Amino acid sequence: MAGPSTTSNAPKQRKRVEAETSSNTSTTLRRAKDGSAFALCEGCNKSVAVALISMHNCSLDAKIRVNLEAQVVETQAEAKKKPAEKKKTTSDGPKPKRLKKTNDEKKSSSTSNKPKRPLTAFFIFMSDFRKTFKSEHNGSLAKDAAKIGGEKWKSLTEEEKKVYLDKAAELKAEYNKSLESNDADEEEEDEEKQSDDVDDAEEKQVDDDDEVEEKEVENTDDDKKEAEGKEEEEEEILDDY
């Protein structure tokens, strides 16, 4: 039998790698003359890290700073707009209470000079019907009166409705007359206001003219005083000679 081969079992040669010594791996720390890690740039008078001083560029930094300042100004302006709009709602002080209108003020504001619209024939009928319905049916609901009254109005003949139609026509005629008189009164008030405005404008113009005349008189008086002063100075000079 052949013996085992020595080449297959021979150990492999390992490469020897030399480790770097401390002299090779030692890093030099950059420092300023005074030992500080920052140095003052003579161009822009800024403190720059000594390790990054080779990448420092004054003109480039100035451009970046200008762009950043512009962006900051824009963002601040946009941020200021929102609080200004919400200033009323975010106030710390107590909100002023709204003055409630009295009943008289409400009536005066709601009721204008115009007359109320006249009732129609159906509503005139219903006002009479409710009176009789309440007297005949005690404790009944208003809904029942309206329902029964509407049915009864439909069942009436034209002759029976004529009484209410005539009343409605009379009320409408009175309403139209009152509207015409009201319009005439409003026109008179407008004319009076216009005349008052014209009078006020004329009075203002007269006052302005008076002020102009007073200023002119004051100016002429000042001119006279200056002329008299010059004459006195000339007389004094002649007396000296």
From Swiss-Prot:
Cellular compartments per GO CC: nucleus
Residue spans binding DNA: 115-183
Keywords: Developmental protein, DNA-binding, Karyogamy, Nucleus, Phosphoprotein
Tissue-wise expression: Expressed at low levels in lateral roots, root tips, cotyledons, leaves and flowers (including pedicels, but excluding styles).
Modified how: Phosphorylated.
Compositional bias ranges of the Basic and acidic residues kind: 77-90
Disordered: annotated segments: 1-30, 75-116, 174-241
Compositional bias ranges of the Acidic residues kind: 182-221, 229-241
GO biological process: karyogamy; polar nucleus fusion
Top-level taxon in the UniProt lineage: Eukaryota
Biased composition (Polar residues): 1-11, 20-29
Consequence of gene disruption: Failure of fusion of the polar nuclei during megagametogenesis.
InterPro entries cross-referenced by the UniProt entry: HMG_box_dom, HMG_box_dom_sf
SMART domains given in the database record: HMG (SM00398)
GO molecular function terms noted in the UniProt entry: DNA binding; DNA-binding transcription factor activity
Location within or outside the cell: Nucleus
Protein family according to the UniProt entry: Belongs to the HMGB family.
Function statement: Binds preferentially double-stranded supercoiled DNA. Required for karyogamy during female gametophyte development, when the two polar nuclei fuse to form the diploid central cell nucleus.
UniProt name for this protein: High mobility group B protein 7
Organism, scientific name: Arabidopsis thaliana
